[in-house]
Regions:
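Conserved strand-turn element in the central/C-terminal portion of the radical SAM core barrel
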Residues: 46, 70, 74-78, 98-122, ...
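Short beta-strand segments at enzyme active-site cores
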Residues: 4-10, 68, 105-109, 138-144, ...
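Short, hinge-like loop/turn segments at secondary-structure boundaries
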Residues: 58, 85-87, 124-126, 156-158, ...
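Auxiliary Fe-S-binding modules of radical SAM enzymes
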Residues: 128-232
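Aromatic/hydrophobic pocket-lining residues that form the small-molecule binding cavity
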Residues: 22, 52, 91, 123-126, ...
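Catalytic cores of alpha/beta
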Residues: 54-56, 114-132
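Conserved SAM/AdoMet-binding glycine-rich loop
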Residues: 1-100
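Alpha-helical structural signal in soluble globular domains
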Residues: 24, 28-32, 58-62, 97, ...
Length: 232
């Protein structure tokens, strides 16, 4: 569609591309789509931190306005157990580096990633990152382990005990309650993996979202999305 106003770059971490090459791609896209307002892409910790501030600013000047970034968890214990390869401080540094270049961040947290034993640590430390950075969008999705990675996951996370949907609802509730952001955040929990779909703006809609989760606990299976209709 030549009238497209938003474009997402590929389905991989394009920030790993040499900056000069990526800028050429961005310029080509702008010529092909003259009404373009936003270009977005995935970004990993390593590739963002490997860019200089000047490089990120040049990318922003060429309409790379938004980076999708997986926080997953703010707990260093959990990050180590899942072999994320980064620390919570590096996650904060990554977000700050993007936002300091006026590139917006859409971040994700994975509910249930710490299992039952690390649930509270997972939530408190994840909320700490949100409260100490300036992301624009926040999404939560629910952990789903494909058969191809299950064995590897449990081998590195030997004390993992899976959370039920009700555990996840409680985790989501506490996470929302703990969020006191610097700026308004557009919040979505509408990924296909989620037992309950939510949307709102934080902190304005915090109470409304908490109440929706309380209702879902009372109504149970009447409102929880059946597993057969979910995707991970």
């Amino acid at each position: 569609n030549p009238d497209a106003t938003k474009i997402f770059l590929a389905d991989g971490d394009v920030l790993g591309i040499k900056t000069s090459v990526l800028i050429d791609i961005l310029k080509y896209i702008q010529k092909a789509f003259p009404k373009l307002r936003r270009i977005s892409a995935y970004g990993s910790t390593q590739n963002v931190l490997n860019k200089t501030n000047e490089e990120l600013e040049h990318l922003k000047e060429n309409k790379l306005n938004l980076v999708y970034y997986g926080i997953e968890s703010g707990s260093d214990t959990i990050l180590e157990k899942i072999n994320k390869g980064v620390s919570s401080q590096e996650i904060i540094d990554t977000i700050n580096k993007l936002t300091n270049s006026n590139i917006k961040v859409s971040a994700t947290i994975i509910l249930g990633l710490g299992g039952i034993a690390y649930s509270r640590e997972h939530i408190l430390h994840s909320a700490r990152i949100i409260n100490n950075t300036q992301i624009t969008y926040l999404s939560t999705l629910q952990l789903g382990l494909d058969d191809s990675i299950k064995d590897r996951f449990f081998k590195s996370f030997i004390d993992y005990f899976a959370s039920t949907d009700y555990d996840i609802i409680n985790e989501q509730r506490e996470f929302i309650e703990q969020i006191n952001p610097i700026n308004n955040i557009i919040f979505r929990s509408n990924h296909a993996s989620n037992a309950i779909h939510l949307s709102g703006t934080l902190p304005k809609d915090k109470q409304k979202l908490v109440e929706q989760l309380d209702v879902s606990k009372i109504m149970g299976e009447e409102i929880i999305i059946p597993m057969k209709y979910r995707g991970f």
